[in-house]
């Protein structure tokens, strides 16, 4: 009988949930759910100095926000716990002591200065820097001397000589590493905390992880973890290393790259929809059959096939994300769109936090004008700018429109019609524009464009009668007067 699929997402709380981490979590989630397997969250917090306050909370909160749930983890428990590495130190200790007893690991007393000098010497000689094994075979006298000096040892794994480590990667196919390319690596730091490679291998085995899906940057860790599996006589899981995510310059997405918004909480703050972000991330390095790009979470689960993970880097296209979020925005009811947009108008000082019923209805109507156009909630501030300014700034295209010979005649006639209106509503404004057409003989662009540019400052925008109705008679007449003088 085949083992039940068990996969894990194992973030370090050294930062908040970003696009790359979210993709790793999402592919593991889809892989597990597609095969009725288990999805586990494990917190790898052994790099204590780099852990940031709120890092773990951010990871869990925004995985949930994206629509993921898990079967075992720090917050839900499970029979393979604890699920936080700093709570598993006794487990690691028992195992690395076993390696020491069997001579498969040893204590290294070299200081940071000695290791750095060794490294610099290797680089100067054009060699690949790696630990040369100076403390691999210390005598008891040497150990006693180092102990007497008060040196604190790390523990290194004794890398086997002349060995090949091969595995069939889910994404890359056959991969081979040679043990001679690796120095003996540290498995326990001087502070007694195990290193990433040791703790991960131990946890993946004890938690019965069947598949390890992670980023390409981890591939050189795989042979080290395989050595640890081998030392204990454990079966290795199946590995899959997903390609990098690159920006539009084809450079690896870096957390320091400010041209791209990278943290999931930033997207929530900007008024993006979690379903759209889920959809977008699911297509970063994985593709379904066919041309369709918009899928629900359940559809992704049903069709997720790891064989379709891409071997090429995944391009992060910000414009594509905006387009995709817009597709989802169009499907939302107006209440949802208002809830995503209104806080941004408040934050920008456009409207008060404490709106009267009448003001709230007006703002709702303004937002409704841009429902189909809006890519994300915060965009309403820029889109609706004309409703909150006393004057309008004309674009070059708009200035050209206003140079037309017919413009003064059209605008004066429209001002007269508008002034006469008792009820300023889209329907009455349409009638007013028709009356101007009849009176002046101008129609089409020659009629509509001068009115649009003079009243809104834009050559393109929402339905003109609706926009004019929301701007109000007084503001529109002032703007027309400014143009015709």
Swiss-Prot record:
Top-tier EC class: ligase
UniProt keyword annotation of Iron-sulfur present: no
Subcellular location: Cytoplasm
GO CC list: cytosol
Catalytic activity as recorded in UniProt: tRNA(Glu) + L-glutamate + ATP = L-glutamyl-tRNA(Glu) + AMP + diphosphate
Gene Ontology BP terms: glutamyl-tRNA aminoacylation
One MF term in the entry's GO annotations: ATP binding
Keywords noted in UniProt: Aminoacyl-tRNA synthetase, ATP-binding, Cytoplasm, Ligase, Nucleotide-binding, Protein biosynthesis
Role played: Catalyzes the attachment of glutamate to tRNA(Glu) in a two-step reaction: glutamate is first activated by ATP to form Glu-AMP and then transferred to the acceptor end of tRNA(Glu).
Protein name: Glutamate--tRNA ligase
């Amino acid at each position: 009988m085949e083992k039940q699929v068990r996969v894990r997402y194992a973030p370090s709380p050294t930062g908040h949930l970003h696009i790359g981490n979210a993709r790793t979590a999402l592919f593991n989630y889809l892989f597990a759910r597609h095969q009725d397997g288990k999805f586990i969250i494990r917190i790898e917090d052994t790099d204590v100095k780099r852990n940031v306050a709120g890092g773990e909370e951010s990871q869990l909160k925004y995985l949930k926000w994206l629509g993921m749930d898990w079967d075992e983890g720090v917050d839900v428990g499970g029979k393979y716990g604890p699920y936080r590495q700093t709570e598993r130190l006794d487990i690691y200790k028992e195992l690395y002591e076993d390696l020491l007893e069997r001579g498969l690991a040893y204590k290294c007393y070299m200081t940071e200065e000695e290791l750095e000098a060794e490294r610099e010497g290797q680089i100067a000689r054009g060699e690949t820097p790696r630990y040369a094994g100076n403390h691999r075979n210390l005598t008891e006298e040497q150990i006693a001397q180092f102990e007497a000096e008060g040196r604190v040892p790390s523990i290194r794994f004794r890398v086997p000589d002349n060995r090949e480590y091969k595995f069939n990667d889910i994404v890359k196919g056959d991969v081979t590493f040679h043990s001679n390319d690796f120095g003996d690596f540290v498995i326990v730091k001087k502070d007694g905390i195990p290193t990433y490679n040791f703790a991960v291998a131990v946890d993946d085995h004890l938690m019965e992880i069947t598949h390890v899906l992670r980023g390409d940057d981890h591939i050189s860790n795989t042979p080290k973890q395989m050595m640890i599996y081998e030392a204990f006589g454990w079966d290795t899981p199946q590995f899959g290393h997903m390609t990098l995510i690159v920006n539009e310059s084809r450079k690896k997405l870096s957390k320091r790259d400010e041209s791209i918004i990278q943290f999931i909480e930033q997207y929530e703050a900007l008024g993006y929809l979690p379903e759209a972000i889920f959809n977008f991330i699911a297509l970063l390095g994985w593709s379904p059959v066919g041309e369709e790009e918009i899928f629900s979470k359940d559809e992704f689960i049903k069709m997720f096939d790891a064989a379709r993970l891409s071997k090429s880097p995944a391009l992060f296209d910000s414009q594509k994300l905006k387009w995709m979020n817009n597709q989802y925005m169009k499907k939302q009811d107006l209440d949802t769109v208002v809830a995503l947009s209104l806080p941004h108008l408040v934050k920008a000082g456009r409207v008060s936090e404490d709106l009267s019923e009448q003001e709230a209805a007006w703002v709702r109507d303004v937002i409704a004008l841009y429902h189909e156009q809006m890519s994300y909630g915060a965009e309403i501030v820029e889109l609706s700018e004309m409703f909150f300014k006393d004057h309008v700034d004309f674009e070059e295209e708009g200035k050209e429109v206003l140079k037309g010979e017919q413009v003064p005649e059209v605008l004066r006639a429209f001002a007269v019609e508008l002034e006469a209106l008792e009820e300023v509503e889209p329907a009455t404004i349409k009638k007013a524009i028709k009356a101007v057409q009849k009176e002046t003989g101008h129609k089409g662009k020659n009629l509509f464009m001068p009115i649009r540019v003079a009243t809104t400052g834009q050559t393109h925008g929402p339905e003109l009668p609706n926009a004019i109705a929301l701007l109000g008679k007084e503001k529109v007449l002032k703007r027309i007067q400014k143009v015709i003088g």
